[in-house]
């Protein structure tokens, strides 16, 4: 697997520095907006012809929420604005996370497009690296890595340019006050995981290893990658062009019209799902899906458009929808989806 480095990436071997005791000390490089790194993933998917690519990044305080999430439900917007925390939407599904310079974000781009295989391979690969550091890290659920029952890494997935992109957090350390203040997880989600506080729910890697965050970055790079591809200034300019989409208010805040009916539920193995329906005479006129589920197909064509003009009755919905909804949303069963629609 190749490591994708920016022109002056602090992880490049020739740019690394060491202290008197031989410990690596990485020089500060340019910190881009979180949206830049999302655009970089797309750029690598489009232009780097390698089987597997990987890179790591750190950002100033930011929250990043999933493609299908309603920002007002997930983010404490006032807190973020008052505390200088930037807000970004990504193109993958999954939930809302907080990131800052004390934790690390991972990006993995592969030609393998089978979602189950890709997730399994990537998460096991990262967990194996943590175990080499003496940490009892194990994959858990659909997208997490756990230490002693607490999450140290959460990951999300989407398809782009015929490749799979997996990205996620690695909690070396973090500002707990900002993490709690910036994100507003649903009480239902917390209850389902049996936790009473965010701190009980997460593990910080610094509590389990005795190396600095700089040493951790180098360790991961050395153990996951067998070579490096260095991007050019021209590549950076093209990435910044892709980034423009991520910065528009339309993309970040979305077009969220008012709907007459709101259906909410949490499905084991799928996640939180909120369906907003505008109906007239019990006929669906508009429908939108929100939540932290994972998209694996075209839900607009495969699911939502099929519902327009359909009566909100079980037999009508069964006829309108395809039998295998897991082709569009990971692990989603037709019966569960119809039950949510009917409230």
What feature does the model see in each segment?
Residues 2-71, 157, 202-217, 221-272, ...:
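Active-site loop/lid in soluble adenylation, ligation, and acyl-transfer enzymes
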Residues 103-143:
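Contiguous, small/hydrophobic- and glycine-enriched helical/loop subdomains that border
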Residues 110-115, 206-210, 291-295:
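A generic structural motif
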Residues 156-157, 170, 273-293:
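Short beta-strand elements
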């Amino acid at each position: 697997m190749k490591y994708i480095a920016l022109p002056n990436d602090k992880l490049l071997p020739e740019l690394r520095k060491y202290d008197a005791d031989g410990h690596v000390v990485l020089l500060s490089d340019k910190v881009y907006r979180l949206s830049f790194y999302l655009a970089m993933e797309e750029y690598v998917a489009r232009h780097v012809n390698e089987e597997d690519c990987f890179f790591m990044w750190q950002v100033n305080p930011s929250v990043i929420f999933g493609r299908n999430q309603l920002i007002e439900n997930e983010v404490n917007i006032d807190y973020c604005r008052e505390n200088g925390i930037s807000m970004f939407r990504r193109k993958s599904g999954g939930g809302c996370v907080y990131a800052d310079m004390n934790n690390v974000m991972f990006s993995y781009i592969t030609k393998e497009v089978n979602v189950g295989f890709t997730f399994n391979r990537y998460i096991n690969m990262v967990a194996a690296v943590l175990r080499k550091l003496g940490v009892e890290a194990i994959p858990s659920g659909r997208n997490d890595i756990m230490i002693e029952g607490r999450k140290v890494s959460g990951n999300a997935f989407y398809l782009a340019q015929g490749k799979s992109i997996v990205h996620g957090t690695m909690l070396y350390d973090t500002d707990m006050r900002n993490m709690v203040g910036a994100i507003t997880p649903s009480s239902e989600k917390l209850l389902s995981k049996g936790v009473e506080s965010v701190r009980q729910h997460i593990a910080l890697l610094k509590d389990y290893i005795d190396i600095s965050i700089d040493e951790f970055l180098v360790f991961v790079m050395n153990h996951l990658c067998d070579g490096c591809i260095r991007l050019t200034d021209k590549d950076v300019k093209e990435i910044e062009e892709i980034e423009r989409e991520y910065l528009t208010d339309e993309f970040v805040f979305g077009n969220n019209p008012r709907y007459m009916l709101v259906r909410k539920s949490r499905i084991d193995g799928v996640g939180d799902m909120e369906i907003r329906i505008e109906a007239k005479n019990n006929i669906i006129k508009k429908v939108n899906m929100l939540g932290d589920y994972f998209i694996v197909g075209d839900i607009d064509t495969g699911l939502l458009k099929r519902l327009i003009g359909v009566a909100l009755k079980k037999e009508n919905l069964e006829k309108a929808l395809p039998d295998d909804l897991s082709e569009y949303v990971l692990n989603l069963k037709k019966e569960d989806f119809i039950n949510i629609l009917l409230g």
